[in-house]
């Protein structure tokens, strides 16, 4: 037993090792040696604020998505020394001290990634000056560092994202629309096309062979 009364939030198995995150008031990251699977050995326990829900091993580093102080986080841990891991970087989604939320914190399919390019796409919701904002944050892992790139705006929260074969275009989908963005320069991504997929209609008026549909303003619903 690793952490009595704590909740297991994330687990990642990688070769001879297992990486586990639990949470009660702080976020312990455990590294367990599985080479003797009849007697797993706890190698280390790292205490950091918040907790992680998604883990991805990248050589001697561990990428994590989680929450700290009601903000979505993207973190990078150095795990080159399994007995002494440490948090090397942490980014927050949205403005400082502003609440944010992400489907990625309970469904890993919400996180888009291109492993060969070190790209991650994190959807999140936040608020600024009383307005709800829906964003897709681009993150790039390069030369052992995590860099925060540009953002893609959505009318309602983006749920899935993927790139084309060239890696130059990002397709992000919400319950309402498909947004196509050019991400050749990840720091200066820009929208190329926005296509409606579904919408809520309040009233429909028929004029001969034409119809006028009046829709609601976007909400935070799927």
Where do the PLM segments sit?
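Feature marking well-ordered beta-strand scaffolds used for ligand recognition
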Residues: 1-222
């Amino acid at each position: 037993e690793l952490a009595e009364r704590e909740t297991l939030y994330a687990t990642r198995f990688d070769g001879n090792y297992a990486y586990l995150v639990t949470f009660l008031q702080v976020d312990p990251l455990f590294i367990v040696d599985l080479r003797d699977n009849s007697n797993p050995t706890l190698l280390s326990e790292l205490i950091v604020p918040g907790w992680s829900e998604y883990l991805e091993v990248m050589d001697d580093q561990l990428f994590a998505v989680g929450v700290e102080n009601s903000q979505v986080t993207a973190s990078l841990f150095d795990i080159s020394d399994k007995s002494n891991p440490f948090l090397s970087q942490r980014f927050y989604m949205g403005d400082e001290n502003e609440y944010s939320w992400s489907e990625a914190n309970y469904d890993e399919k919400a996180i888009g990634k291109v492993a060969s390019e070190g790209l991650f796409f994190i959807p999140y919701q936040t608020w600024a000056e009383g307005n709800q904002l829906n964003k897709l944050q681009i993150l790039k892992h390069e030369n052992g560092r995590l860099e925060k790139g540009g953002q893609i705006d959505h009318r309602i929260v983006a749920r899935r994202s993927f790139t084309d074969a060239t890696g130059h275009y990002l397709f992000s989908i919400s319950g309402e629309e498909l947004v196509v963005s050019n991400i050749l320069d990840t720091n200066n991504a820009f929208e190329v096309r926005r296509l409606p997929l579904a919408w809520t209609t309040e009233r429909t008026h028929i004029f001969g062979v034409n119809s006028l549909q009046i829709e609601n303003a976007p909400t935070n619903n799927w």
